[in-house]
Regions:
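C-terminal membrane module of polytopic membrane proteins
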Residues: 47-53, 210-281
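Functionally important transmembrane alpha-helices
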Residues: 177-235
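Aromatic-anchored segments of alpha-helical transmembrane domains
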Residues: 21-29, 90-99, 158-167, 210-221
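Active-site-flanking alpha-helical
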Residues: 130-139, 172, 208, 215-216
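Alpha-helical transmembrane segments in multi-pass membrane proteins
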Residues: 11-65, 78-100, 110, 114-119, ...
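Hydrophobic alpha-helical transmembrane segments
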Residues: 13-17, 83, 87, 151-156, ...
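Short, Lys/Arg-rich, polar N-terminal cytosolic tail immediately upstream
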Residues: 1-8
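Membrane-interface helix/loop boundary segments of multi-pass membrane proteins
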Residues: 129-156, 194-201
Length: 281
């Protein structure tokens, strides 16, 4: 029996507890951890973030398993075409035009880029397990699997995902940049929640998330390039068109989704229902 299964008697309460754990793990002293491995001021934060988020991902995976969500009935990994708009959004986050034109460049060695790629995967794994594999199904369990309920579950889980990025203020991030990050993190969270709902592929969501982070943060972290050079007019126009297309595509997909498929993400098995009936809380 899963040790934390009893928490699913109150899905919103369970979601709140998991969210508090996620916030706490987000606040781990990544830079200090990184200094245990290297004195390089450029590499230490990357190494620390990679280690802390990898450990956090394992912790969240443990919670996911113990809540009976990791082995919940999954929809077949199909209709991968539904992930194509998300993949385009993720790839477009890289400053391709600026890199080709030479107005932006990656100046770090290949080893640093490889470490940064691992960091992006670790961050994505932690956040996808926490917000898509745990919080989102718990909210589906609470609200239901109808169109309006699915919409509410996507919005609430993604809003919590976006608000978590407010913690960056404590590490010295600018208010404007943090507000922008909260906004686009909410939108990315909505997109990934719908992808997860439709495909049932947690690994796919992790990959999309990692590609998005890698493309968007590689130059600012390990390269050089002015903001206006990276976000030049062609890039802004392409991004705007892709954003509108993705919003319309995933909103239609969400509202037209099969309720049975949504239910498979949060439905308790017969064994789990029997176990819950024996638990008195």
């Amino acid at each position: 029996m899963r040790a934390l299964l009893f928490l699913r008697k109150d899905p919103l309460g369970a979601a709140f507890i998991i969210y508090l754990f996620a916030v706490g793990l987000t606040g781990l002293p990544c830079e200090q951890v990184g200094r245990l491995f290297t004195d390089d001021p450029r590499i230490a934060p990357i190494a620390g973030m990679a280690v802390c988020r990898a450990v956090s991902a394992v912790v969240m995976l443990f919670f996911c398993i113990q809540l009976g969500l990791f082995d919940a009935p999954r929809p077949a990994v199909r209709s991968l075409r539904a992930a194509l708009p998300a993949l385009l959004v993720a790839l477009n986050n890289a400053p391709v035009i600026a890199l080709i034109s030479g107005t932006a460049a990656v100046t770090a060695q290949a080893s640093a880029v490889t470490l940064f790629a691992f960091e992006c995967v670790a961050v994505a794994a932690f956040e996808e397990v926490a917000f898509r594999a745990i919080l989102f199904p718990l909210m589906l369990q609470r609200f239901g699997t109808g169109a309006r309920a699915r919409f509410s579950a996507v919005l609430l889980s993604s809003a919590l995902f976006g608000l978590t990025h407010l913690l960056n203020l404590f590490s010295g991030a600018a208010v404007g940049a943090t507000a922008l990050q909260v906004g686009y993190s909410f939108l990315i969270g909505c997109m990934l929640a719908v992808v997860y709902l439709h495909t049932g592929s947690l690994a796919g969501c992790i990959l999309l998330h990692a590609v998005y982070n890698f493309g968007g943060m590689l130059v600012p972290t390990l390269g050089q390039g002015a903001f206006l050079d990276i976000w030049n007019l062609p890039t802004v126009l392409i991004t705007a068109v892709l954003a509108v297309f993705a919003i319309v595509f995933y909103l239609r997909l969400l509202l037209r989704e099969d309720a049975l498929r949504a239910g498979s993400l949060c439905r308790l098995t017969a064994e789990q229902r029997f176990a819950l009936r024996r638990i008195h809380v």
